[in-house]
């Protein structure tokens, strides 16, 4: 649930442990 500070491109996030939700990267 914490924003990782980047949008996700092609449904992937460059920051480990983060997942793409609604166009943005979140972790927990």
From Swiss-Prot:
GO terms for biological process: defense response. Keywords: Disulfide bond, Knottin, Plant defense. This is a cyclic peptide. Contains 3 disulfide bonds. Pfam families: Cyclotide. Transmembrane segments: none annotated. Belongs to the cyclotide family. Bracelet subfamily. Probably participates in a plant defense mechanism. The presence of a 'disulfide through disulfide knot' structurally defines this protein as a knottin. This is Cyclotide vodo I3. It comes from Viola odorata (Sweet violet). The lineage of its organism: Eukaryota, Viridiplantae, Streptophyta, Embryophyta, Tracheophyta.
